[in-house]
A protein has these predicted regions:
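Active-site beta->alpha loop and helix N-cap motifs at the rims of alpha/beta catalytic domains
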Residues: 2-102
Length: 102
């Protein structure tokens, strides 16, 4: 596991389009806003990110998108585990790491 930087980590919400799809253009704007304003990291994909309204695939795609747009500028932290089964939670968290979470 990587060492996470100390500092400011806002909780990132998940913006949705009018037809209830993840709004990737708005996510890109949030990443740019956080980077431009000196955040050290983003707490992406957590309870405040509406993870219970996202499928595992959507969470992984979102984490991957955030990581690409971030391009290493800030640390990325995610919980993103919604399963009731511990083994499944481990798999969900591994997928978050595989898609850019630290």
């Amino acid at each position: 596991m990587k060492q996470i930087r100390n500092g400011i980590y806002p909780t990132m919400i998940t913006p949705f389009t009018d037809d209830n799809h993840v709004d990737y253009a708005a996510i890109e704007q949030l990443v740019e806003y956080y980077a431009a304003n000196g955040c050290d990291g983003i707490f992406a994909l957590c309870l405040s990110s509406e993870i219970f309204h996202l499928s595992d695939k959507e969470m992984q795609q979102m984490m991957n998108f955030i990581a690409k747009k971030n391009n290493g500028r800030m640390s990325l932290v995610a919980s993103g585990h919604t399963s009731l089964n511990v083994d499944a939670q481990i798999e969900q968290l591994k997928a978050m790491c595989d898609n850019g979470a630290e």
